[in-house]
């Protein structure tokens, strides 16, 4: 290890000394050059080239064929090719805010003997630059670096293998090649001469390559041996400016220079370089207008004798159909025709993808370096573009105007050794950290408790020792797993936190848990005991068990097995008074008001013949509700199954559904914050029961505001179980199923994988909670952030809870409880289902929110009492 470090220091010193001999800031990489052959001075330019070995972590070395070597310069004879991975990147240290001319060279040279030129893409950082599909080409771009590290990436787009021969960077002055936005991609750079050949460094101090153009037949080349004053920052070579082209006949009025743009809609910048090479007599004048696409861009211009001037537009231009025409048009007072020495054109490339937060990039690279991680995908920008996201990372980049942030780091089973490094705390937005199944030693660092966004920490399967920091144990909404660390001291006493009432909340350190979950665990255990007792003593209760749901309840039998609570169609007609009063309409059909025996009010949902829901879902809902009973699940009074006449008969919910109240469709008073929290809590309890109280567990699959019903006392009941699914195998964590649900509420992970878990309901509930907080539509096509979660996420960056809270509440709420509810909703909607809370945890947190709001209301009531007047 020491030998490697010493070698790196020596190599760095050599590189520094070598580069000091070149113009300041020049980077010259000979890709594929061995360390032993580095550095060397290229004979024609005098520039010093070094191996690319320290600038890229992947790739193999190749050489062009022997017969071609004599035709090319030494840097172009070797190459680096990338058979492995999709994106392979060079990482270069640069100066942030500096404009660079970036020049990679690609000379295939049949290095692989296949004689097939590869096709691949080139990226600058996270943004696509250009496709490389030709042999012996140099690509150029003028680009301002947004950080102190510049990454040039080769991306495989098919079966062919990307390669590169040289990579060169040249810093430029800020006040040349100015543009409004974006980067400038090389289109052409020409000068006019009778002598063939290119002009480059050292003639051009910026190492631009100038291509010679022969004049047209009716044009001539002017030359001079005198020195040209080229000190206008563009610093064109003397050889370029000592020649110019002009019409042979003085009477010629116009010089034309056509070219085509690809794609035709491209914007471009044009830079024209002039210097008068003839000493004009007193009676001679050279004056002309610069006309681009028929528009005069510079009027009555006269080049100065032996002094270079550059004419350019400050705004980008476009050409009709991509066909461009530059004209130099002689003015009426001019005695001589126009002339021009050189011109350049660059197309505008907008790079819309913002690089990942600089501090977090530095942090993750330090982590990579410290642990010696050599993951194939860990190259380029960690988060963007999304298709190249680093393995083990999740990022939040929903807002295009702000840098992406790292939200999850999974280094499980990565062979990590040593301690948990302090650098991790610089990932300030990290929500999930998984360092499990490594060989980490030392203690559990206290800084983990100070990371405000952190919700999940998995340190299981390591060799950690010492005591778990109390701050970490006491942190709320944190899942902590330290299982499999035999040297770690976490006794029951050290892992206990006292609640406000002096009760003990045991936090199991061997499974992921949420802070302050004791009461919910107790409730769940009590419920299970209750269910077992009732199962073992069926004679104690005539009703079916409210906890056990048979595994075959989703059988494909043609009729419903249970005959209890079955009504005839004639009875349905009677109870609805021939379907007199409509309560609502949905995808299932029409819902009518009715009464049983003239006393019990009911809602009768008739299955439409055109319903997409169908008999299967009708049957599923009946069999579920006949067996499952909970105060927060809508009660099934009965059903009708008579030929094609299918009806579900529910208990009547006088106050309709939550959506009607949030949208104002129902009229009446606005639901205050306390009532909303009560509704959310009761709906959550209904879901918690489906997930934990039923065996096998049930997943609702269609949790939304229209399926949350309210009775006359605003008690809440979850409804519409037609899409519900059970997990028939005990211990099964998911089922694979066709995606079903409502757009906007649908779990993206479930949609993507077809794997249904109870966490899919948790996601949907998070959406419901955001709707209750904000009173915003779930999907709004007129909103920049169309989905409610994106909109809330963007607003939260401002730190003002009022900006997202329903204005109808008029600020009448405890801001702490609103913040807690928002945080809970966002955690429910975490992209990774593993990091979402369970419904038990959601219930507990909502109870705390409601308690906080209730105590505020009580204190306000006391605060309005008349106080005694001072005497």
UniProtKB/Swiss-Prot annotation:
Active site: 702 (proton acceptor)
Residues modified to Phosphothreonine: 568, 737, 742
Residues bound to ATP: 583-591, 605
Phosphotyrosine found at: 650, 750
Cellular component per GO, a single term: membrane
Annotated signal sequence range: 1-20
Bilayer-crossing regions: 513-533
A Pfam family assignment: Pkinase
Annotated localization: Membrane
Keyword terms, alphabetized: ATP-binding, Glycoprotein, Kinase, Leucine-rich repeat, Membrane, Nucleotide-binding, Phosphoprotein, Receptor, Repeat, Serine/threonine-protein kinase, Signal, Transferase, Transmembrane, Transmembrane helix
Modified residues (Phosphoserine): 736
Gene3D superfamilies: Phosphorylase Kinase, domain 1, Ribonuclease Inhibitor, Transferase(Phosphotransferase) domain 1
Glycosylated position list: 93, 179, 229, 283, 295, 396, 410, 439, 458, 463, 489
Spans within the Cytoplasmic topological domain: 534-871
Catalysed reaction, written as an equation: L-seryl-[protein] + ATP = O-phospho-L-seryl-[protein] + ADP + H(+); L-threonyl-[protein] + ATP = O-phospho-L-threonyl-[protein] + ADP + H(+)
Alphabetical list of PANTHER family matching this protein: LEUCINE-RICH REPEAT PROTEIN KINASE FAMILY PROTEIN, OS07G0107800 PROTEIN-RELATED
Family to which the UniProt record says this protein belongs: Belongs to the protein kinase superfamily. Ser/Thr protein kinase family.
Protein name (database record): Probable LRR receptor-like serine/threonine-protein kinase At1g51810
Species of origin: Arabidopsis thaliana
């Amino acid at each position: 290890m020491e030998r490697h470090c010493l070698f790196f220091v020596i190599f760095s010193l050599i590189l520094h000394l070598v580069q000091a001999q070149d113009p300041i800031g020049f980077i010259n990489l000979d890709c594929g050059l061995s360390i032993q052959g580095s550095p060397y001075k290229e004979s024609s330019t005098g520039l010093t080239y070094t191996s690319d070995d320290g600038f890229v972590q992947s790739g193999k070395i190749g050489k062009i064929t022997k017969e071609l070597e004599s035709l090319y310069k030494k840097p172009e004879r070797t190459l680096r090719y990338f058979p492995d991975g999709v994106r392979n990147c060079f990482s270069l240290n640069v100066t942030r805010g500096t404009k660079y001319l970036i020049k990679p060279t690609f000379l295939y040279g049949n290095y692989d003997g296949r004689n097939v030129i590869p096709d691949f893409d080139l990226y600058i950082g996270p943004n696509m630059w250009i496709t490389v599909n030709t042999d012996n080409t140099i690509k150029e771009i003028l680009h301002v670096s947004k950080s102190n590290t510049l990454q040039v990436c080769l991306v495989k787009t098919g079966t062919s293998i990307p390669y590169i021969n040289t990579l060169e960077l040249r810093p430029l002055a800020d006040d040349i090649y100015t543009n409004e936005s974006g980067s400038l991609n090389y289109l052409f750079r020409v000068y006019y001469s009778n002598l063939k050949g290119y002009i480059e460094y050292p003639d051009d101090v910026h190492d631009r390559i100038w291509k010679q153009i022969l004049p047209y037949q009716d044009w001539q080349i002017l030359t001079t041996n005198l020195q040209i004053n080229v000190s206008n920052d563009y610093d064109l070579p003397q050889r370029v400016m000592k020649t110019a082209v002009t019409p042979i006949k003085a009477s010629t009025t116009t010089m034309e220079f056509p070219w085509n743009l690809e794609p035709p809609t491209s914007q471009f910048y044009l830079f024209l370089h002039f210097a008068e090479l003839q000493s004009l007599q007193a009676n001679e004048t050279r004056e002309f207008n610069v006309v681009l696409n028929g528009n005069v861009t510079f009027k009555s211009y006269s080049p100065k004798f032996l002094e270079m001037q550059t004419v350019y537009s400050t705004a980008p231009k476009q050409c009709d159909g991509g066909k461009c025409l530059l004209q130099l048009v002689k003015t009426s007072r001019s005695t001589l025709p126009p002339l021009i020495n050189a011109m350049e054109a660059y197309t505008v490339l907008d790079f819309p993808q913002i690089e990942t937060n600089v501090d977090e990039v530095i942090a993750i690279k330090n982590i990579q370096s410290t642990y010696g991680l050599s993951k194939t995908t860990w190259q380029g920008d960690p988060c963007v573009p999304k298709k190249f996201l680093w393995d083990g990372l999740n990022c939040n980049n929903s807002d295009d105007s702000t840098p992406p942030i790292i939200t999850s780091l999974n280094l499980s089973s990565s062979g990590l050794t040593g301690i948990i490094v302090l650098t991790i705390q610089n990932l300030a937005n990290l929500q999930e950290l998984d360092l499990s199944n490594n060989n980490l030693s030392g203690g559990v660092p206290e800084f983990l408790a100070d990371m405000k966004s952190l919700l999940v920490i998995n340190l299981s399967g390591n060799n950690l020792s010492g005591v778990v920091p109390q701050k970490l144990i006491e942190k709320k909404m944190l899942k902590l797993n330290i299982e499999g660390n035999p040297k770690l001291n976490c006794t029951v006493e050290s892992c206990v936190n006292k609640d406000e009432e002096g009760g003990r909340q045991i936090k199991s350190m061997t499974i992921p848990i949420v802070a302050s979950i004791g009461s919910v665990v107790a409730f769940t255990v009590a419920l299970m005991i209750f269910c077992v007792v009732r199962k073992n003593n069926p004679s104690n209760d005539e009703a079916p068990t409210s906890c056990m749901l048979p595994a075959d309840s989703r059988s494909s039998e043609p009729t419903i097995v249970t005959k209890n609570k079955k009504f005839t169609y004639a009875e349905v007609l009677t109870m609805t008074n021939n379907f007199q009063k409509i309560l609502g309409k949905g995808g299932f059909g029409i819902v009518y008001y009715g009464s049983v025996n003239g006393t019990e009010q009911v809602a009768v949902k008739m299955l439409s013949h055109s319903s997409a829901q169908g008999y299967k879902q009708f049957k599923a809902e009946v069999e579920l509700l006949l067996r499952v009973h909970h105060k927060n699940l809508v009660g099934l009074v009965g059903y009708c199954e008579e030929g094609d006449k299918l009806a579900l008969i529910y208990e009547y919910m006088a106050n309709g559904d939550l959506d009607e109240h949030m949208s104002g469709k129902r009229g009446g008073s606005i639901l205050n914050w306390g009532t909303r929290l009560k509704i959310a809590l009761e709906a959550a309890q209904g879901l918690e029961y489906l997930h934990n109280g039923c065996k096998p567990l049930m997943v609702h699959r269609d949790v939304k505001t229209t399926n949350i019903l309210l009775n006359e006392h605003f008690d809440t009941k979850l409804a519409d179980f037609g899409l519900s699914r059970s997990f028939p195998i005990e211990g099964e964590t998911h089922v694979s199923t066709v995606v079903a649900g409502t757009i906007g509420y649908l779990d993206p992970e479930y949609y993507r994988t077809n794997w249904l878990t109870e966490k899919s309901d948790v996601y949907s509930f998070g959406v419901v909670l955001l709707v209750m907080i904000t009173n915003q539509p779930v999907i709004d096509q007129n909103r920049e952030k169309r989905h409610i979660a994106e909109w809330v996420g963007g607003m939260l960056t401002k730190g003002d809870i009022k900006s997202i809270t329903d204005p109808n509440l008029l600020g009448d709420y405890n801001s702490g409880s609103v913040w807690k509810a928002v945080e809970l909703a966002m955690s429910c909607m975490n992209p990774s289902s593993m990091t979402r809370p369970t419904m038990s945890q959601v219930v507990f947190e909502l109870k705390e929110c409601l308690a906080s709001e209730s105590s505020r209301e009580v204190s306000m009531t006391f605060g309005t009492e008349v106080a005694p007047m001072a005497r």
